[in-house]
């Protein structure tokens, strides 16, 4: 009996110390996020931070000279502030521009001629940012010879796992951003906070996001207009590509006080947010839409009403054509990942009948 009691007491003495040996360092703070759901950041004493993205990415962000928090020794490390970044995600560069961090970017997967944002095109033409190959075929020799502190990919790289493995094999940390999975348009913009933390520009990132959030809140307070909107483009084969209910463009139309005119679509068979339907189906659903918005990014802009009507003889019978409510997107709109709040504000102006003919993201087709 006495021996058993001694054994129990010994275990009670040893257990706390064993627990302490395996204890993880205490989290001292967490990045405040209002809309983004696909990443989180925990802070630790000494400046280290733990970054989680999606369900299977876990990193330790480690400033120079900072100690590794207990329990996080096994995590892959990203030195911060990161320099010489390779942005293989086309949605990221605009966010770097808005927080004045292009000087931390060394490489892009988009060529100069394919940029519609003047500042990014100029940065590449002036060779402040270099083209390092598209995401699926990076220029490994260039990255090795000039150095690369971090590779930022989008989820397309998941279809090319060998590329990610090769980059990591060469010693480059690879981060896959999931901003396109954010359910709220402002969630996409809030990824600027992560990029700010990675580059030492968090105050600038937070200030930009706060301005965008205020712009959004101003538009959100407006009453629903009841106006229906068809956002589309016509393919070279004559089909019409429209947005599904779950797509973020449809979500922005709704947040702006409008309603999508396209509601009768087949059940989704994949994760794509678009659907190509026959012109006859589009005509039946969008003929009486209050507003038509043509997506110039996919197949080119329409400079005037004559060019728009030349796309299909059926378009002349649409209500929005008769009322002068046909709009076209500016070519840079989809590269401006920072502009969600501005897009919502301009969409609200369009559906409420208060828009000028020329906006930053749209223009009226006349």
Predicted regions and their residues:
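Positively charged n-region of N-terminal signal peptides that target proteins for export
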Residues: 1-8
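A short, structured surface patch at a secondary-structure boundary
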Residues: 49-53, 59-144, 150-156
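Extracytoplasmic ligand-binding site segments that recognize negatively charged/polar headgroups
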Residues: 83, 90-96, 108-119, 159-162, ...
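Bacterial Sec-exported substrate-binding components of ABC uptake systems
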Residues: 20-93, 204-232, 355-366
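Flexible, glycine-rich surface segments
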Residues: 214-215, 221-303
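C-terminal segment of classical bacterial N-terminal signal peptides
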Residues: 14-20
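Structured C-terminal subdomain patch of bacterial secreted/periplasmic proteins
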Residues: 182-200, 204-207, 291-366
